[in-house]
A protein has these predicted regions:
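Histidine/acidic-residue-rich catalytic or RNA/ligand-binding cores of hydrolases
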Residues: 100-103, 144, 223-225, 262-268, ...
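Histidine-rich, glycine-flanked metal-binding segment
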Residues: 40, 45-86
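Bacterial N-terminal signal peptides
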Residues: 11-25
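Alpha-helix-loop-beta-strand connector modules within alpha/beta enzyme cores
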Residues: 149, 153-167, 229-254, 295-296
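Active-site gating loops and adjacent loop-to-helix segments of metal-dependent hydrolytic enzymes
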Residues: 98-115, 124, 171-186, 221-235, ...
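Metal-associated gating/positioning segment near the N- to mid-region
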Residues: 83-155, 171-174, 178-181, 236, ...
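Divalent metal-dependent hydrolysis catalytic cores, especially in the metallo-beta-lactamase
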Residues: 118-144, 158-167, 210-223, 251, ...
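His/Asp/Glu-enriched, well-ordered alpha-helical/loop segment
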Residues: 109, 247, 251, 316, ...
Length: 434
């Protein structure tokens, strides 16, 4: 790594000026953009590249080279002195249509469509925080599909969304409504029991726009009445779900805190384990054998315990979080040391969307290097999504999704909480300090 000193204020001011001048370029030059910077993280090799020059044509990267290379005629230039470029970040576990300030029973005061609007606002915050792709693993009323469609049509601003729609769950489980009495409880569309019901539910969610299937294999923290580690689907049910999803070309994420549920989910063939709090050495070995990824939300314990009570989180949930938060971090450390494949997943929505990058510091504190944490949110995440042709690295053929920080994220990974530059598909989204 170069010992070049950084000047954040000057660099950010310079970004703003240069981007404004670029915005005045002729429309005819907008199809090709050339971006230069002080350095770039090559997440595929783990190297730092000095003075990169990236050419983006029609939204995709067409060349990656060194500054001074030939620039296409009529190209629009974006020069970022003092800036470190990274690929757009990927969060593998978001809930865009959630707001932690309205937790527990407080959520019930709003109309269903209120949460669609919340999701639109959160999508913009998430993109401006440097997350150009998210996997949204649970959203009512197919809201994440609606927001994805609105983003793709240019109606609203947000990241690329891989939507799960509803999370599938067993009656009385973490993905069911467990806080209301029978007289007012409303059946959830993705509650399913037994192999055939589960298969039919997978088909229904795909019909209405799901691009990944998420199900609850064990209890959880923020549900009111279940035990956090208790298994809620047996191996036969899990295998039926996974087989159906894979047959339809969809990958599968499982919410699983408990040990037995994690192991059965891996045996059933899931692609990612969400939370993985109580995974043991046997689970690590199974994950390595099957190529299963862990997506562990190890920052949000801080937020839940600090803010949860005043936000309306159930007393029972706070007790569960106190019992499992530290253990999950210890499991993360052990799983990483054991060589389990890891992706970056935050559970944003449990804490505010837009603050997703807070988790990088926690991942480094619990055993990863800054580069490993960044790779979890870029190259690894793209591989787990099955979208390495499109996202996850600054490489020819992939989308022109770039972010820039004015510090050195390998020296201080907290720099990723203050992204100064965001580009999605070759279009500048943000070019100023937070």
């Amino acid at each position: 790594m170069s010992s070049t000193s950084f000047a954040p204020r000057i660099a950010v001011a310079h970004i703003a000026i240069l981007v404004m001048s670029c915005a005045l370029a002729p429309v005819a030059s907008a199809d090709t953009v050339v971006v230069t910077a002080a350095r770039m993280l090559d997440v595929l090799t783990g190297r730092v590249v000095e003075h990169p020059q990236i050419t983006i044509t029609d939204g995709r990267i067409s060349a990656v080279g060194s500054a001074g290379a030939e620039i296409p005629a009529a190209a629009r230039r974006v020069d970022l002195p003092g800036v470190t470029l990274l690929p757009g970040l990927i969060d593998m576990h978001t809930h865009l249509t959630s707001d932690p300030h309205f937790s527990g029973y407080r959520r019930l005061q709003f109309t269903d469509n209120f949460w669609t609007v919340v999701g639109v606002a959160n999508a913009k915050k998430t993109l401006e925080a440097g997350f150009t792709t998210v996997r949204n693993v649970g959203s009512a009323n197919y809201d994440d599909v609606a927001i994805k469609q609105a983003i793709e049509q240019g109606i609203v601003t947000g990241p690329r969304i891989v939507p799960a729609t509803y999370a599938i769950g067993a009656t009385g489980g973490h993905c069911d409504s467990t806080e209301l009495p029978p007289s007012v409880s409303v059946p959830k569309p993705a509650v399913a029991n037994g192999a055939e019901e589960i298969r039919a539910t997978v088909r229904k969610l795909r019909k209405y726009g799901a691009e990944v299937i998420k199900f609850c294999g064990t209890g959880g923290v923020l549900s009111k009445t279940d035990t956090v580690g208790g298994q809620q689907y047996d191996l036969t049910e899990m295998k039926a779900l996974v087989d159906e999803a894979h047959m339809l070309g969809l990958r599968v994420a499982v919410h699983a805190h408990g040990t037995s549920g994690i192991k059965d989910a891996i045996r059933a063939g899931v692609d990612t384990i969400e939370h993985a709090s109580l995974a043991d050495e046997e689970a690590f070995a199974l994950a390595k054998q099957h190529g299963t990824w862990f997506s562990m939300d190890i920052y949000d314990d801080d937020y839940i315990l600090a803010e949860g009570e005043k936000n309306g989180v159930y007393k029972e949930s706070l007790e569960k979080e106190r019992s499992i938060g530290l253990k999950q971090r210890q499991t993360f450390q052990a799983a990483h040391k054991a060589g389990v494949k890891m992706v970056f997943g935050t559970d944003a929505g449990v804490y505010p969307n837009g603050f997703n990058a807070r988790q990088f510091v926690t991942m480094v504190k619990w055993g990863m290097t800054p580069m490993q944490a960044i790779q979890a949110a870029t190259a690894n995440a793209a591989e787990a999504l099955g979208r390495t042709a499109d996202v996850g690295a600054i490489a020819v053929g992939r989308y022109g999704d770039l972010i820039g920080v004015t510090g050195d994220p390998l020296a201080d990974v907290a720099q990723l909480q203050s992204v100064a530059f965001v580009m999605k598909g070759g279009e500048i989204v943000k070019a100023s300090a937070n």
